[in-house]
């Protein structure tokens, strides 16, 4: 945050939450930072994603992409630049944040409920237990719109050719 907010004084993390059932690719933390700027006390909530200690669950897709946290940040940044789906504001990617000794990035916090990865949100949790059919319909339709938006990105024009490990212009899936 000191890079993102160089004018901030007395910057500190005042709240920290580690959700237990979200994020297979990287670990998720939710934190609130406070600081002073020109004599005014400010605070903001963020979501952090950090590289798992064990290196993550996905195989390396190609040399130079060993860090899934880097891959996620770079793709999210491109998706945000394309403006095809709502996406939180991203902060910088940190290759090896000294205080946690891992790769890390943060983004703005968006209020809402987080569907669980374990147990699957389609089996247990708020979506099954307390959502109305209309709320489930909205979630599914919003998800489909987001997927369609992402699939509308012209990957070469968006600068994603670095994902093509085949080098042929026809990426392996």
Residue map of PLM features:
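Juxta-kinase regulatory segment immediately upstream of eukaryotic protein kinase catalytic domains
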Residues: 1-18
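ATP-binding pocket architecture of kinase catalytic cores
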Residues: 17-173
